[in-house]
Amino acid sequence: EEARDFLEEVPAKQPWMGTSCCPAWSVMAKKLYPEFADYISMALTPMVITARMVKKDHPDAKTVFIGPCSAKKLEANRRTIRSDVDFVLTFEEMLGIFDAADIDFSKLQANPEDEMDEGTGMGRGFAVGGGVAAAVVEAVKHIDPDRKIQIEYGDGLKNCRKMLAMAKAGKRDGYLLEGMG
């Protein structure tokens, strides 16, 4: 979806496109630069897409997202997402649960039947800084192999602000910008 959006919009209709699976970045970008709100991708995050797929196949299931950032809790509380994602835990909270339950991972045996080898490297890389942009670039290569995309990645809200300031100054035209708060 984002690859098609980028190809259709940049630079013909807008100078650049912003993307991220980080709600903190998206909210910050839209608050600091409301004029850029339409430049920030509205594509659903993997958390929401996965939860919706689970709910479609198992309507009574409870979905739990476990990740590094508490900002995902804000995303899960959005009116349009509330019914999809039931709980969000940070890694720190999950480790606290394991600790309280006396679960020691170093003593657990791996079960080969539980191996999850169906995902792709691009899909697994979404949560890593620059991972969304890398997936978009890869998808663009399949759609339009001759199209070159310049990307910039900002890690931390301070660096994201700098990146957006450069975009506002017209120094990131044609770029795909990814931020991670």
Where are these regions (language model features)?
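Iron-sulfur-associated redox domains of electron-transfer enzymes in respiratory
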Residues: E1-G181
